[in-house]
Amino acid sequence: WVPILESWDFEERTDLVAPSLYHAIYHYLAYVIVEDDLGEEVANNYANNWYFWQERIQDLVVQDYGRYWIDDQRTKDQVEDLHDLIRRAARLGAAKLQAISGDEPTTLNWGEIHKISFVSPLRPGGPGSRLLGGGVFEKEGSGETLNRAGYSRTANIEDGFDTSFVAAARLVMDLADPEKIKAVVAGGVTARQFNDHYDDQIPVWVDGELLTWWLSKDKILEQVKTKLTLTTNVKEMD
């Protein structure tokens, strides 16, 4: 793993192996740091909630006081350092990657284990869900990147790194231009199943592109392709 991680440019692209290895280690780092103090069950519950530990763990691994947490209290005849726990987390991470895919971890690209699924609330899972949904795509990035695509941590070794929260809407605004913005949403602008605009922005969103959204009424009318007219058919009552 070391040569792959040493040559990594820290970009979490879908075609790279290094992000898979990094997140496999990071997945277990908080757990192995506190497991000797809290026990297996509580340590897993703690590590499963990013908001409980992320800033604290990242702070203590670079601060001197962190050595008191990093040392394993169960080994009275030795003092563990961060490198020891990273190696321990890597062994657990390797087993997890193996359980997820059955492949050798050093051949597993990030996109193979980090995907995003667009589902319909009418049928979020089971038979027919793919028909009603918007598709499954490999997803770059993570919860710490621009266009974030974070995953939920669980104690189940077979649970992967599929995306569970994202930056759903992206927007670029020129404050000197009152007529338009550049934006895209992860889906479409209508929630009506089978409508043309239910999922038509997904390909643009997945590719990291933006669309022009007109704000000026005149410009909107210039771009009109279809028009919806709402009328009433209420008869006058005698």
Question: How would you name each of these model-derived features?
Answer:
Residues W1-D238:
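Long, compositionally biased non-active-site segments enriched in small/hydrophobic residues and glycine
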